[in-house]
Amino acid sequence: ALLFIPGSAPMNLYYSDYEPGIQLYSRHVFIMDKCKDLLPEYLRFVKGLVDSPDLSLNISREMLQQSRNLKVIGKNLEKTILKTLARKAEKERPEYEKFWNEFGKSIKIGIYSGMMTGENNADKLKDLVLFYSARQGRLVTLKEYVEAMKDGQQKIYYAVGKDKESIDALPQTELLKDRDLDVLYLFDPVDEFAIEALHEYD
């Protein structure tokens, strides 16, 4: 497999006319241009190709959807992509933040949609999510927030608003800051759905 993540998100990434998918080959013979069934929807931004000797050259889209080989390939690719992103988040933060600014919404949608469909995406994706920390003045992972919590703090505090100024002005934010508690700022409408879908973080 040869996969990559573009440097910037297409304008129509979250619109119905966007066609995700990976090029599919078998033994170097082209099968399909955009195989949507290979990767989960929340990785719709990933581009590239897969060349597998285990796929039939004469296979319909319906048969592809039922192909065990394709499902195994897809699961392995998903694990590899998530592992790569997790490593970037930990070791190459500036690069990861560039990725997050372009494609972070897809990860958050993946967390929320997983809750709706019964797939447990939260465990796979929770350490990839970044939110703005009021105390640290930067984007942090939930792990980083928890590691910086005060002794005895049991909850993750967050506030929702259209921008930093509007959240700063909330009485609740002021109250938490006065108690020296960190607050995560949620600016994107999907943020609140994602963080509620996570339920808890340990």
Where are these regions (language model features)?
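Conserved GHKL (Bergerat-fold) ATPase module
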Residues: 1-202
